[in-house]
Curated annotation (Swiss-Prot):
Species the sequence originates in: Ustilago sphaerogena
Gene for this chain: RNU2
Assigned EC number: 4.6.1.20
UniProt KW keywords: Calcium, Disulfide bond, Endonuclease, Hydrolase, Lyase, Metal-binding, Nuclease
UniProt protein name: Ribonuclease U2
Disulfide bonds: 1-54, 9-113, 55-96
GO MF annotations, alphabetized: lyase activity; metal ion binding; ribonuclease U2 activity; RNA binding
């Protein structure tokens, strides 16, 4: 499905460019084998979270959604990933959803961004 023009994740509003930059950053990290920050990593679709993925079947990956991205952190320069993520189809980079830990039912759970 198409990347939305914007998304609201618990009050953080991201543009289409922010979302696209996050997906591209994730794909670049994988291609370069550069993952000291442990992102991207696999996303597990938990039925209890009621997240709608608008892309094809998995595997899916998640990557931090930040302003002025893409997100990058290293052992020597740790940067918090924040609460917001973009979910994409691991093999194709197709956009699936934006999700946030803000307001989720559990500490490590997600809720869908609007």
């Amino acid at each position: 499905c198409d990347i939305p023009q914007s998304t609201n994740c618990g009050g953080n509003v991201y543009s289409n460019d922010d979302i696209n930059t996050a997906i591209q950053g994730a794909l670049d990290d994988v291609a370069n084998g550069d993952r000291p920050d442990n992102y991207p990593h696999q996303y597990y679709d938990e039925a209890s979270e009621d997240i709608t993925l608008c892309c094809g079947s998995g595997p899916w990956s998640e990557f931090p959604l930040v302003y002025n991205g893409p997100y990058y952190s290293s052992r020597d320069n740790y940067v918090s990933p924040g609460p917001d993520r973009v979910i994409y189809q691991t093999n194709t980079g197709e956009f699936c959803a934006t999700v946030t830990h803000t307001g989720a039912a559990s500490y490590d759970g997600f809720t869908q961004c609007s």
